[in-house]
Amino acid sequence: MAKRARLSTSFNPVYPYEDESSSQHPFINPGFISPDGFTQSPNGVLSLKCVNPLTTASGSLQLKVGSGLTVDTTDGSLEENIKVNTPLTKSNHSINLPIGNGLQIEQNKLCSKLGNGLTFDSSNSIALKNNTLWTGPKPEANCIIEYGKQNPDSKLTLILVKNGGIVNGYVTLMGASDYVNTLFKNKNVSINVELYFDATGHILPDSSSLKTDLELKYKQTADFSARGFMPSTTAYPFVLPNAGTHNENYIFGQCYYKASDGALFPLEVTVMLNKRLPDSRTSYVMTFLWSLNAGLAPETTQATLITSPFTFSYIREDD
């Protein structure tokens, strides 16, 4: 009976089946194992190559889980673990921001919800909407009544407030010269104030009785347009020469003059809108006429002429 050959005590039963003492290629991976994903560390010990976020620090292949993540203990799934503070809320792994009054979502952005009277200015700050065009509440002498004079002789207070599709107006006149303050020593007096505006709603001072431009009440800017305060040329078209008059261009009313002795004298007030177009520079016109027709003159001596406020409304031009 033949004897089996005895294996060397240094024989390695793992491929390539060589004696460690005689092997010319120590620690070569077996032919059926790819080096991709594996490494020998230390030599002769096969292990996995791990890069973040994988680790075998605990003896098994695991994910390194940082703050905000957790592994579900029931099914082993990876889940977020984010905590939120008020006003944020969390529901079904979604973070929400409750929206209160004054806020809205617009084009997937959180925005301020502005009501009437508010707007965004050029710096994207919330500002009061410029819906008031005026002379100011108490102007200096700014208007010329006496024909041919160069210096203002009266104070015109004019306030125009946009309200939807109309403008609400307020006007009053105060004398600032001997000429104006002696007018009511007469029984019959007519005081005429003409305002001519360009295409952007700015006063043309060389042709207007008012010699200073009207201003916005809030945040005056040098290049603002006041067109939206002007009387609509559709509602109040200019009257062509020899074409008669348009009654819709006239607003009639009454205010009062209080004499030095306390007596009240009615003044007929006529507001004429786009009465006539004097030249190519003019796009809008407002004319104010105060008329006194009294049996007796209100004054016997000089007294400051002050008309009571007169209010009116008209359809405005589009902005």
Swiss-Prot record:
Keywords: Capsid protein, Host nucleus, Host-virus interaction, Late protein, Repeat, Viral attachment to host adhesion receptor, Viral attachment to host cell, Virion, Virus entry into host cell. One of its GO terms (cellular component) is host cell nucleus. Belongs to the adenoviridae fiber family. It holds the Pfam family Adeno_shaft. This is Fiber protein. Forms spikes that protrude from each vertex of the icosahedral capsid. Interacts with host receptor CD46 to provide virion initial attachment to target cell. Fiber proteins are shed during virus entry, when virus is still at the cell surface. Heparan sulfate might also play a role in virus binding. It comes from the Viruses. All late proteins expressed from the major late promoter are produced by alternative splicing and alternative polyadenylation of the same gene giving rise to non-overlapping ORFs. A leader sequence is present in the N-terminus of all these mRNAs and is recognized by the viral shutoff protein to provide expression although conventional translation via ribosome scanning from the cap has been shut off in the host cell. Induction: Expressed in the late phase of the viral replicative cycle. The tail region anchors the fiber to penton base capsomers, whereas the shaft, built from several repeated motifs, allows the knob to protrude from the virion. It comes from Human adenovirus B serotype 3 (HAdV-3). It is found in: Virion; Host nucleus. GO terms for biological process: adhesion receptor-mediated virion attachment to host cell; cell adhesion; symbiont entry into host cell. Shaft repeats lie at residues 44-73, 82-103.
